[in-house]
Amino acid sequence: MARAFPLERVRNIGIAAHIDAGKTTCTERILFYSGVVHKMGEVHDGAAVTDWMAQERERGITITAAAISTTWDDHRINIIDTPGHVDFTIEVERSMRVLDGVIAVFCAVGGVQPQSETVWRQADRYSVPRMVFVNKMDRTGADFLKVHGQIKDRLKANAVPIQLPIGAENDLKGIIDLVENKAYIYKDDLGKDIEQTEVPSDMVDLVSDWRSKLMESIAETEEELLEAFLENGELTIEQLKSGIREGVLKHGVVPMLCGSAFKNKGVQLLLDAVVNYLPAPVDVPPIQGLLPNGKEAVRPSDDGAPFSALAFKVMADPYGKLTFVRMYSGVLEKGSYVLNSTKDAKERISRLIILKADDREEVDELRAGDLGAVLGLKNTTTGDTLCASEEAIVLETLYIPEPVISVAVEPKTKSDMEKLGKALTSLSEEDPTFRVSTDQETNQTVIAGMGELHLEILVDRMLREFKVEANIGAPQVSYRETIRASSSGEGKFARQTGGKGQYGHVVIEVEPGEPGTGFEFVNKIVGGSVPKEYIKPAESGMRETCESGVIAGYPLIDVKVTLVDGSYHDVDSSEMAFKIAGSMAFKDGIKKCNPVLLEPMMKVEVEVPEDFLGSIIGDLSSRRGQVEGQSIEDGQSKVQSKVPLAEMFGYATQLRSMTQGRGIFSMEFSTYEEVPRNVAEAIISKNQGNS
């Protein structure tokens, strides 16, 4: 089957921003103007096409990354609308991993906000080219150039306006295109009757000034353009367009556009910019991966290359399990068999789907550069590679953050107990930041996630989708344990019961690992003191002990273990004996390595009227917070601080009462830090049942 759109005319883009910057409304307008929907859906009415989960429509926020295909100017545009709430950061993370370009939406009033910075960092992590759309230009206090300054200062980006608003707030009449040096005046409320005209006389000087700045910025991106600029004193429209595109692809330029999605202004020009400036799959570097022999390899964006794809999202569906894939190379055909190289398992491709939010179109194949979904894969989860069996490769996977908060879940009835297991399995398959475990002491089921809202939504989904009624415990902090010193450990398990005995013996060295490595195991056995078949069981015993910690029952992180010696018995040694010996050695070593407790620290930004600044700082300090910065703008104070999550429960209520309801705050995970000794002692004592 021939390709519907050449790869050069495909755009895989994401729309990402801080909560309430207007991402979903922006997506809705794109769908309206490109003809996918014929009636606009509004987020506040619960009718947005991309907000298809019940909780999204009720809360007016986007929780999952919805994928939609549309067309514009003879280009295929695949769009992912991502959530802005920090609790759903994995949705943004996995979207960034599979996109070629991003539209970062900023509120013209709020400007750069904490989650905007998080999204920007995520785009940096995956080197995603981007452009900026300053939305809500119709709102009181809207200021395009103020946002431009904030993006340059706070995000350290070379933001270059390629548009200017004509008017602002209630007087937003249209948009100046600085590249074409033209004005677009909106004549109707639907944004379809647009008059292209000359720049208004009262804006000629301002436009001339910003157009010169645009030319200077673009000239600096390429030597040829700089020569042309110095020779002629200006750049042609074509030179400007090609220069902006090159600048975006090389991460040297971030074009800035403006408008009001809600008031239907600026969306068609935004679509033009997506086509003109954001990359096609062939414009970005080919995806890298590892071959079975451990060598690095790349897969070019080409239908003729061996098939490779990344599963970036798994979702429960009435017809079975939907696995969203980004096609990187080759062709995937319905009815074929492929390899899941991450799990070394074969998968059959029963049905292929292209999604239009909650609508779908079945197709016979997906090609390089496509975003689509596969129905009915058995073994594939988020971050897995699918590839041709004869051309195996494992692609770079996703960064998955650790959960920071947990609650106990207790089903109300026996039938709920049976349904709970099914619900938790399904939800954890969909969301890698949602973890399920069993408390060894109480035998309770414990669920962990990225924040209170994250867990609240998941519990709500258990009730709605799986009909599970459960009692939910109070939120608990997900502490971690680590070590600060190095030592050795030894474990010898020897037991004689009747005939065959049990014997396993290992000697290890334990030391702090690199931050973010979790548990690292190195085998340095020489001469066969521990046979090869017993090394994996010994490691397994250590890993399991790692999960339950040694001082307070929390998982151990950033620990490096080296297996250096041991002994075995020809008759009595077994895998189980070495697993137990490994666990014993690990406990022995860790106790001598100065184990400490770590707690999640949150990056907290509070915005309050100036009068309340003193009491807010005092309150944050009383919560063991460290104030890292503050600023005052237009009578509003912003305080940036780092506060332990354990001290932040109930903060929203406290902030409301301290500021008469006029304060707002945002919170996101920052890092794990050591718990002060007096606090740690209380936590350890409580967990050991001594309090």
Curated annotation (Swiss-Prot):
Q: Which GO terms describe its cellular component?
A: cytoplasm
Gene3D superfamilies for the chain: 3.30.230.10, 3.30.70.240, Elongation Factor G (Translational Gtpase), domain 3, P-loop containing nucleotide triphosphate hydrolases, Translation factors
Q: List the disulfide bonds.
A: none
- Which domain of life does the UniProt lineage start with? Bacteria
Q: Where does GTP bind?
A: 17-24, 81-85, 135-138
Keyword GTP-binding on entry: yes
Q: Which GO terms describe its biological process?
A: ribosome disassembly
Classify the main location.
Answer: cytoplasm
A molecular function (GO) held by this record is:
translation elongation factor activity
Q: Which UniProt keywords apply?
A: Cytoplasm, Elongation factor, GTP-binding, Nucleotide-binding, Protein biosynthesis
Q: Which parts of the chain span the membrane according to its record?
A: none
Q: Where is the tr-type G domain?
A: 8-282
Compartments annotated for it: namely:
Cytoplasm
Q: Which SUPFAM superfamilies match?
A: EF-G C-terminal domain-like, P-loop containing nucleoside triphosphate hydrolases, Ribosomal protein S5 domain 2-like, Translation proteins
Q: What does this protein do?
A: Catalyzes the GTP-dependent ribosomal translocation step during translation elongation. During this step, the ribosome changes from the pre-translocational (PRE) to the post-translocational (POST) state as the newly formed A-site-bound peptidyl-tRNA and P-site-bound deacylated tRNA move to the P and E sites, respectively. Catalyzes the coordinated movement of the two tRNA molecules, the mRNA and conformational changes in the ribosome.
The record's family statement is: Belongs to the TRAFAC class translation factor GTPase superfamily. Classic translation factor GTPase family. EF-G/EF-2 subfamily.
What name does UniProt use for this protein?
Answer: Elongation factor G
